[in-house]
Amino acid sequence: YSPLPDGSRDGTYFLNTYKPETKSIFEAESVAFHEAIPGHHLDRTIAVELEDVPDFQKYVASTAFVEGWGLYSEQLANEMGLYSNDIQQLGRLGNDAWRACRLVLDTGMHGMGWSRDEAIKFFRANSPIEEINANIETDRYIAWPGQACSYKMGQLKIEELRRKAENELGNMFDI
């Protein structure tokens, strides 16, 4: 995804078009803002342009920061008035519920002994995720403990830092 260091190739946003009839379009804008601008594309483009940062920090970043920024970007796009309609807003809110569920699912399965079926049942009851995706995502969380939590935890930390900047800068703060 990241652009090449020498600028010879731009960053690329790959869209999964496999079985489009199974995809929800109500979250399309939320995903695009997460992946492109103001999300990952903006973040990774700026990272490679930094001059006083070691190369390894330009190209390898923590999941909590990178994905936290992606989630933060979904809300930032809302503040900027970029969502085109209420259906896309609903998609953003549904995605937010899904990311919050990750915290509960990961903790439930890896800390509280929840079964896969218990996790899927919770997921389906508390987010708008479709059954097939709930199964796939739950299997991912089983195989990769803590990774999915890092998204929301990163977002929460970025929001905390933003509040601090808003308080310190007052009227000078501007998104």
Where are these regions (language model features)?
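Long, His/Glu/Asp-enriched segments that create or flank divalent metal/ion-associated functional microenvironments
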Residues: 1-175
